[in-house]
């Protein structure tokens, strides 16, 4: 879990300055969060599911192209996002989402992340 990012290992990969240099590459948080948000919105707008998931995957894979992640980070982030979405639904995150969807997802994502850290 403490793998260095591609652009840190290979300085020849040019990236923009980023705070992510201080955090491990695995798994991709962008991929994970994109999947969670896409699944939530797709639950409200089922006809848009294909496009939403495509956008989520493009967001996550863009981080591979940019040199911030390996493909395995992207894959793990997607899988983690799918699993976290299921768990978040079991935690009943509807109340916060109804009021402010973006804030509600951040709150429950943080709650679940903290819970998972305690288990590991």
Cite the ranges covered by each PLM segment:
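Membrane-embedded catalytic cores of phosphoryl/pyrophosphoryl-handling enzymes
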Residues: 3, 7-120
């Amino acid at each position: 879990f403490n793998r260095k990012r591609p652009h840190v290992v290979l300085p020849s990969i040019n990236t923009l300055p980023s705070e992510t240099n201080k955090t491990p590459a695995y798994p991709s948080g962008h991929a994970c969060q994109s999947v969670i948000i896409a699944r939530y919105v797709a639950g409200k707008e089922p006809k848009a599911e294909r496009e939403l998931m495509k956008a989520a995957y493009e967001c996550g894979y863009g981080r591979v192209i940019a040199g911030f992640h390996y493909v395995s980070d992207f894959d793990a982030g997607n899988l983690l996002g799918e699993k976290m979405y299921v768990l978040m639904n079991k935690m009943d995150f509807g109340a916060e989402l109804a009021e402010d969807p973006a804030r509600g997802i951040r709150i429950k994502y943080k709650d679940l992340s903290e819970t998972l850290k305690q288990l590991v």
